[in-house]
């Protein structure tokens, strides 16, 4: 009888140990989850995925990222650097939380668009083309000049091409480049007339290295925009950064 009772107690003790181990593991998991949730809510940890072009990163997003990192050093920020069409695809595919892009943008019921700041597209030239400085030009005169511009897969190129087509002009570029910084460098070397966003050219113009071409009808200004996906919520960290923008 003692042996039987002892066996029952042993079984009960073993079952209790097994139950306790599961309960303890569950409690630890819950405790860890609560701790991680608290860290997320208090901006001590987390990550943000952003899409941005060279233009929007340099002339809009970067100062905000610097300020955000000073406020919340524990938050990791991943930036996918790509032109506007690719950034839109990344957003709608769920690869980024939000994007900073340039208009015009395609109509999409899933995409929420918020205008951030105004931008202007201009043409610039170097000393080789000094005879154009101070003149008011017609866009048809671009047909006779070597043109340097961005590649086709950018919103900037699409916008400028569309505007010029309404003016009866189709650009036949000598050089098509992937970044606006390179356009400025090519123009500096007198390789042609550059189609560029004004912000990229301003420092060169201020120093007198390059000058802006003047036209009878300026290209209408457009906007940098913040885009997000209406179908998906964003993390606490992503929402906090959006509040700063």
Kindly give the residue locations of the regions a language model identified.
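Single conserved hydrophobic/aromatic residue that forms the stacking wall/gate
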Residues: 1-6, 10-11
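Alpha-helical "hinge/linker" immediately C-terminal to small N-terminal DNA-binding modules
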Residues: 11-39, 45
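Central regulatory/effector-binding core of bacterial HTH transcription factors
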Residues: 45-107, 177
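A late-sequence structural motif
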Residues: 60, 211-245
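Hydrophobic hinge/microswitch elements
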Residues: 83-96, 102, 156-213
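Flexible hinge/capping segments at coil-to-helix
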Residues: 110-148
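Short beta-strand->loop
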Residues: 112-122, 207-220
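Secondary-structure junction motif
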Residues: 131-133, 138, 146-167, 234-238, ...
């Amino acid at each position: 009888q003692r042996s039987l009772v002892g066996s029952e107690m042993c079984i009960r003790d073993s079952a209790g140990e097994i139950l306790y181990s599961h309960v303890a593991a569950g409690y630890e998991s819950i405790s860890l989850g609560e701790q991680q949730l608290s860290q997320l809510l208090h901006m001590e940890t987390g990550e943000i995925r952003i899409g941005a072009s060279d233009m929007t990163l340099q002339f809009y997003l970067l100062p905000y990222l610097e300020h955000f990192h000073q406020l919340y050093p524990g938050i990791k920020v991943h930036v996918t650097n790509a032109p506007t069409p690719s950034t839109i695809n990344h957003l709608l595919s769920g690869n980024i939380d939000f994007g900073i892009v340039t208009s015009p943008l395609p109509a999409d019921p899933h995409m929420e668009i918020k205008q951030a700041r105004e931008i202007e597209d201009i043409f610039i030239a170097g000393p080789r083309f000094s005879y154009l400085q101070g003149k008011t030009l017609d866009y048809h005169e671009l047909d006779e000049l070597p043109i340097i511009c961005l590649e086709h897969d950018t919103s900037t190129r699409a916008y400028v091409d569309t505007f010029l087509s309404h003016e009866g002009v189709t650009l036949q570029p000598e050089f098509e480049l992937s970044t606006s910084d390179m356009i400025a460098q090519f123009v500096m070397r007198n390789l042609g007339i550059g189609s560029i966003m004004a912000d990229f050219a301003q420092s060169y113009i201020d120093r007198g290295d390059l000058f802006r071409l003047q036209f009878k009808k300026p290209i209408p200004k457009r906007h940098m925009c913040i885009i997000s996906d209406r179908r998906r919520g964003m993390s606490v960290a992503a929402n906090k950064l959006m509040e700063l923008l």
